[in-house]
C-alpha cells in the first residue's frame, strides 16, 4: 500500500490544518524542575536549628505574647460554644437539652467536669 501511495504522487502534509494544536506544542516545557515548593520539614532540616543560639527567633521557637482576646466559653458536656451557665452547678451549657443533662448529674460528676476545666471549688 505504501508503494502505491508513493507512485500516486499524493502529498500529505505533516500537520493537518484542521487539527488543533496540542498543549505541548503551545507551551514549552518548564525551564527548571528544581524550583518547587518546599515542605516545612524540608526547611527545618536545612536550617540546622540545633546549631543556632536559643534566643534567635526561628520557625520553631517564635515566642508570642498572651492573647488579648478572652478565651471561648465552651460547653462542658458537648464542647460547643456555651452562652449559658447553670448557677447551681456552675457548669456551662449550650442549649436546653444539655441543661436537662446538667441538672440530672450527681454532685461527684459535676465536680469531675469542673476539675477538667480547672474550675473546681476546693473546700478546706
From Swiss-Prot:
Compartments (UniProt record): Nucleus; Cytoplasm
Keyword Thylakoid in annotation: no
Domain of life of the source: Eukaryota
GO biological process assignments: chromatin remodeling; DNA recombination; DNA repair; epigenetic regulation of gene expression; ethylene-activated signaling pathway; positive regulation of gene expression; regulation of ethylene-activated signaling pathway
Keywords: Cytoplasm, DNA damage, DNA recombination, DNA repair, Ethylene signaling pathway, Nucleus, Stress response, Transcription, Transcription regulation
InterPro entries, per the entry: INO80C/Ies6, Vps72/YL1_C
Null mutant phenotype: Differential expression of several genes. Compromised ethylene-induced H2A.Z eviction dynamics. Plants missing both EEN and REF6/EIN6 (e.g. ref6-1 een-2 and ein6-1 een-1), are insensitive to ethylene (ET) and exhibit reduced levels of EIN2 associated with a shift of the chromatin landscape to a repressive state at its locus (e.g. H3K27me3 and H2A.Z).
GO cellular component: cytoplasm; Ino80 complex; nucleus
Pfam assignment, any one: YL1_C
Tissues of expression: Expressed ubiquitously in seedlings.
Range of residues in the leader sequence: none
Subunit note: Component of the chromatin remodeling INO80 complex; specifically part of a complex module associated with the helicase ATP-binding and the helicase C-terminal domain of INO80. Interacts with ARP5.
Function text: Proposed core component of the chromatin remodeling INO80 complex which is involved in transcriptional regulation, DNA replication and probably DNA repair. Together with REF6/EIN6, involved in the epigenetic chromatin-dependent regulatory mechanism that monitors the expression of the essential multifunctional plant stress regulator EIN2 via H3K27me3 repressive histone demethylation and histone variant H2A.Z eviction, thus modulating responses to ethylene (ET), especially during embryogenesis. The INO80 complex controls ethylene-induced H2A.Z eviction dynamics.
Family to which the UniProt record says this protein belongs: Belongs to the IES6 family.
Protein name (Swiss-Prot/TrEMBL): Protein EIN6 ENHANCER
Source organism of this protein record: Arabidopsis thaliana
Gene encoding the protein: EEN
